[in-house]
């Protein structure tokens, strides 16, 4: 199928909310070997974020049921729950591996500017983070190191090449701070990164273009929400919700 046709079908699949189809079309477009435009890389991100989002939610529900049945000593239900959770886990790992393969084989190498490179390195960190959520033992440690490395490389580039209010830079800092808090067990680092990012963006808010204003201020609000939650948790209070990250 022609590249233009794949992109068009991905847009149709998005409108129909058929995200697995959308992901398959965008995978085909990436494998054609041309650099993606800004619109196209967003299509890729939305497609896989929706596919993996459903799997992450299902895995969390099943893990919770499995834990409860283990605590109750339910020999009847336990093996079935574990088997189904493992099935979902395998599917989730497959999607993450596909995305990471596209990033390493095509997207990061073909990125022609700093913004694209940061976008794809952030994506790499995100998909290693999703793998870390379901990993155990030595595997988990290796995956966490890979996520941290991708996020850090993206942070280094974004600080040199992008203003503090750039929505991609803000989204990266938001997700890296969630990684510190949820995956790496480093609440102080999470709070420090979120606070510094928010403060620097606030100081630079007057430079924002009308196009970026909505995206940037939305991510800044998510940073502030997470900061409120995390500082309350650190003070020994119960957090009311999971840390937030952008939807695309």
UniProtKB/Swiss-Prot annotation:
Keyword terms: Cytoplasm, Nucleus, Phosphoprotein, Secreted, Ubl conjugation
Residues with site note (Interaction with phosphoserine on interacting protein): 56, 129
Record's comment on post-translational modification: Ubiquitinated. Ubiquitination by RFFL induces proteasomal degradation and indirectly regulates p53/TP53 activation.
Sites bearing Phosphoserine, chain numbering: 5, 74, 248
Gene3D superfamilies, per the entry: 14-3-3 domain (1.20.190.20)
UniProt cross-references to PROSITE patterns, sorted A to Z: 1433_1, 1433_2
Major place of residence: cytoplasm
Tissue expression pattern: Present mainly in tissues enriched in stratified squamous keratinizing epithelium.
Subcellular location: Cytoplasm; Nucleus; Secreted
Annotated function: Adapter protein implicated in the regulation of a large spectrum of both general and specialized signaling pathways. Binds to a large number of partners, usually by recognition of a phosphoserine or phosphothreonine motif. Binding generally results in the modulation of the activity of the binding partner. Promotes cytosolic retention of GBP1 GTPase by binding to phosphorylated GBP1, thereby inhibiting the innate immune response. Also acts as a TP53/p53-regulated inhibitor of G2/M progression.
Subunit: Homodimer. Interacts with KRT17 and SAMSN1. Found in a complex with XPO7, EIF4A1, ARHGAP1, VPS26A, VPS29 and VPS35. Interacts with GAB2. Interacts with SRPK2. Interacts with COPS6. Interacts with COP1; this interaction leads to proteasomal degradation. Interacts with the 'Thr-369' phosphorylated form of DAPK2. Interacts with PI4KB. Interacts with SLITRK1. Interacts with LRRK2; this interaction is dependent on LRRK2 phosphorylation.
Listed name of the protein: 14-3-3 protein sigma
Name of the gene this protein is made from: SFN
